[in-house]
Amino acid sequence: MLRGVFVTGTDTGVGKTVVSAALLHRFRGTPGIRYWKPVQTGIEADDDTAEVLRLAGAASAQALREGVRLPRPLSPHLSASLAGTSISLPPLMDLAWAQPDGDRWIVEGAGGVLVPLNDRELMVDLISVLGLPAVIAARSGLGTINHTLLTIEALRARAIPIAGVVMVGARNPDNRVAIETRGHVPVIGELPRLEPFTPEALQQAAEGIARGGELDALLGG
């Protein structure tokens, strides 16, 4: 059984990879801290695993190879269909259960929680069977309250614990308060949009991830 967190998002392109890299760097002192992207679409143009390792300043041994690698940057079910294949949960679970018990994992999803993996299952079903609490990557700006609260509802409908929300973009105190009070979840970090998109910028921004409490229990040494 994996220990750690599953980084999901309120949408695609909200900053899941940046949040994953920030967590990997923030908890770099934890023995056995590792990263895994179970499903990667658009592999010819986007390699999130390589990007997380680059930004976090982590070694290649700290990442597990993707369980599914698909060429087109589309929803996982559609990218798989166009590649003449399909995504099945059991092989992903076999890969997860084969990992050492003592490791701590930052697992990154693709898209949002209700993106389809196949004709029957959604990304949230993968989160559920992995048994990991979710960290939600959310935009900081207009529209994020609705998107984040919907994501929280979808996770809670499946009894998936939520470790917290990380907001990405310019600080917006009003949106932060609305998400915390109406969603009953902590905002555990606020990260700026990285400019430039460098390891130095990411590693400085990673200090915006709060240490302590549940997150330390999940990812700390």
What positions do the PLM features span?
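N-terminal phosphate/diphosphate-binding loop that engages ATP/GTP or pyrophosphate donors
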Residues: L2, V18-S86, P90, D94-A98
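Glycine-rich phosphate-binding P-loop
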Residues: F6-A21
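Short internal beta-strands
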Residues: K37, V135-A138, A163-G169
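Short, structured coil segments at secondary-structure junctions
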Residues: A56, L130, R182-V185
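Switch II (G3) loop of P-loop NTPases
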Residues: P91-N118
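Inter-motif core of Ras-like GTPase G domains
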Residues: N118-G141
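C-terminal lobe/tail of nucleotide-utilizing enzymes
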Residues: I152-G221
